Amino acid sequence: MRSTAVLALLLCAGQVFALPVNSPMTKGDTKVMKCVLEVISDSLSKPSPMPVSPECLETLQGDERILSILRHQNLLKELQDLALQGAKERAQQPLKQQQPPKQQQQQQQQQQQEQQHSSFEDELSEVFENQSPDAKHRDAAAEVPSRDTMEKRKDSDKGQQDGFEATTEGPRPQAFPEPNQESPMMGDSESPGEDTATNTQSPTSLPSQEHVDPQATGDSERGLSAQQQARKAKQEEKEEEEEEEAVAREKAGPEEVPTAASSSHFHAGYKAIQKDDGQSDSQAVDGDGKTEASEALPSEGKGELEHSQQEEDGEEAMVGTPQGLFPQGGKGRELEHKQEEEEEEEERLSREWEDKRWSRMDQLAKELTAEKRLEGEDDPDRSMKLSFRTRAYGFRDPGPQLRRGWRPSSREDSVEARSDFEEKKEEEGSANRRAEDQELESLSAIEAELEKVAHQLQALRRG
C-alpha cells in the first residue's frame, strides 16, 4: 500500500511541475493568439465575414510585435515598388538614348521648313519688287550688258568657225571620200539660224538660255571625251599591230637568203599582184619594171599612211572645234551619231585594207616557198645553173645559144664534155637537194611563224 501511495504522489508532483506557470507575459500572449485566431476565422468566414471584436482590435494594435510585423510587410512592399521603378528606369534608358537622333531629325525638319518658308517669302518679295517700276528699270539696265556679251560670243564663235574651216580645207585623198567634211558645213548652216534665234528672242528668255547652256556644254564635253577614248584605243591597236609586224619581219628577215633568181621572182610576184590592180603586163619582164614595182608598193603604203594621218588630223580638228558650233539638244546627238557611223566606216575600210595586205603577204609567202623549193645555192658554174633553173621554171631557154657557142671539134671532145656535164649535173643535183632540204625546213618554220602571227592578229581583231 505504501508503494502505491508513493507512486501516486510522484505522478502528481510530475504533473504539477509540467503545468505552465501563469505569468502576465503569457496572459498577454494568449490574448494576442486568441485575437489572431478570431481575425483569421472572421476573414475566412464566407460568404458573410464576421467583424472583429473591438477588444481584439485593441489588443492587436497595442502589441508591438504585430506592429513590427506589419511595418516589415510595408517595408517589403516599398522595396518591391522601388525595384519595379528601377527596372522601368533601366528599360527606359536605351529609349532615352535613341530619342536624341529623333529629336535632331525633328529639329532638322523644322529648320528645313523654316528655310523653305523663308525662301518662299524671298521669292514673293522679289516678285513684288520686280513688279515695281524701279525693278523694271534695273532689268532693262541688266539686259543691255547681257546683249553685249551675246554679241561678243557670236563674234568669237565666228572667228573659231573661220579657223576651223581653214584647218579642214587641207588636202585630202580622193580614194576614200570622208563624210567628216559634212560636219563643218552643218555647223555653218545651223549657226546662222541660232544667231537669228538669239537675236529674235525676248530679253526674258536670256536667263533660261544661260541656264540651259551648261547642260549642252556638258553633253558636248562627254561626247568629245568618248571620241578621244575611242581614238586612243584605235591608236594603241595600230601600234600593237605595227609592233607585231616588225617582230615578224625581224624573225623572217635573217632566215631568208635572197639570191639573184629569188629576188627576180619576188619582184615578179609583186608585179603579178599589181597586174590585178590594173597595171601593164610589160613590167613583169623588164628589169626597169622590177624597180618600178618595188617602188610602187612602198609608195602605196606611204599614201595609205598619209591618208590615215590626214584622217587623224581631221579628227583632231573636230575635237578642237568650239562647243558653240555643235547645236544643242537633239542636234548634238545626231552629230554624235553621224560621227560614230563615220568611225565605223573607217574601221571597216581599215579592216578591208589589212585583209588585202595579209592576203598579199600570204600569196608572196606561198610563191617564195614554191620558188625556194626548186632553187639551189650559188655554184662556180653560173651558166649551167642558170640554164637548169630556166628550164625548170619555163622561162626563155638560153640552151640553144649555149649550144651554138659550144661546138665540139671531135667526137672524143663531145663525149668528154658530155661526161663532165653529167658529173656536174649529179653534183649539182646532190647539192641542190641538200640546199632544198635546208630551205624547206627554214621555209616551214617561217610559214609556221606567219600562221601564228596571222592567228594572233585575227584574235586581236575579234577581241
Curated annotation (Swiss-Prot):
Pfam families attached to this UniProt entry: Granin (PF01271)
KW Secreted (keyword) present: yes
Residues found modified as Pyrrolidone carboxylic acid: Q438
Stretches with biased composition (Basic and acidic residues): 134-160, 301-310, 331-340, 348-375, 409-437
Residues carrying Glycine amide: G329
Post-translational modifications: O-glycosylated; contains chondroitin sulfate (CS). CS attachment is pH-dependent, being observed at mildly acidic conditions of pH 5 but not at neutral pH, and promotes self-assembly in vitro.
Modified residues (Methionine sulfoxide): M384
Disulfide bond residue pairs: C35-C56
Protein's GO biological process: defense response to Gram-negative bacterium; defense response to Gram-positive bacterium; mast cell activation; mast cell chemotaxis; mast cell degranulation; negative regulation of catecholamine secretion; positive regulation of cardiac muscle contraction; positive regulation of dense core granule biogenesis
UniProt subcellular location: Cytoplasmic vesicle, Secretory vesicle; Cytoplasmic vesicle, Secretory vesicle, Neuronal dense core vesicle; Secreted
Region (Disordered): 88-440
Keywords on record: Amidation, Calcium, Cleavage on pair of basic residues, Cytoplasmic vesicle, Disulfide bond, Glycoprotein, Oxidation, Phosphoprotein, Proteoglycan, Pyrrolidone carboxylic acid, Secreted, Signal
Subunit structure: Self-interacts; self-assembly is promoted in vitro by chondroitin sulfate attachment which occurs at mildly acidic pH conditions. Interacts with SCG3; this interaction is optimal in conditions mimicking the lumenal milieu of the trans-Golgi network, i.e. pH 5.5 and 10 mM Ca(+2). Interacts with ITPR1 in the secretory granules.
Further details from the record: Binds calcium with a low-affinity.
Protein name: Chromogranin-A
Protein species of origin: Mus musculus
Gene giving rise to this polypeptide: Chga
